[in-house]
């Protein structure tokens, strides 16, 4: 399912450890990561996953910006990452890749079961970045809902071969 914060890495790991396909909702993973870091990341789970991220400079930048030891004050607002657009800044691209990596890495940690990432075809701007992060964490399955994902197989093949990929965005309105 696409339950943001419900179909997360913990549930996906538990389902996968029971011999079924555990699925992480890929929607708003960047927001979930940054908010949980600002809540202090009790137990250090997210920081441990970021330490395994293959681009340490990106992980450091995320931690420097969003991690608050002990958590933010209850009345303090969250620092919210910018909304992703068709040309996101480098820092946001890194955050989306890392957040997808973290979710899949944690869902797969400590077992050999299958873990998938579920993305929505209609939310296209983070798709390439989320797929790349999930593939870095060795995601087993990619599921796509809310549309026909015609471009996704080629993108996955390109990333698997170590090549860059691109995706055309559907634009409506004026």
Where do the language-model regions lie?
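Active-site entrance/lid segments in N-terminal catalytic domains of soluble metabolic enzymes
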Residues: 1-174
């Amino acid at each position: 399912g696409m339950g943001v914060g419900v179909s997360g890495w913990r549930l996906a790991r538990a389902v996968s450890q029971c011999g079924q396909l555990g699925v992480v909702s890929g929607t708003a993973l960047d927001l979930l990561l940054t908010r949980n870091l600002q809540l202090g990341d009790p137990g250090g789970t997210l920081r441990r996953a970021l330490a395994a991220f293959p681009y340490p400079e990106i992980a450091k930048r995320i931690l420097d910006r969003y991690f608050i030891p002990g958590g933010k004050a209850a009345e303090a607002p969250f620092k919210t990452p910018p909304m992703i657009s068709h040309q996101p800044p480098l820092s946001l691209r890194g955050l989306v890749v890392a957040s997808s990596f973290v979710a899949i890495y944690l869902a797969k940690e400590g077992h050999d079961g299958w873990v998938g990432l579920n993305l929505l075809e209609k939310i296209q701007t983070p798709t390439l970045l989320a797929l790349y992060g999930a593939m870095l964490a060795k995601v087993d399955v990619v599921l796509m809902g809310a549309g026909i994902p015609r471009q996704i197989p080629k993108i996955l093949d390109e990333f698997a071969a170590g090549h860059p990929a691109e995706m055309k965005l559907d634009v409506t309105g004026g």
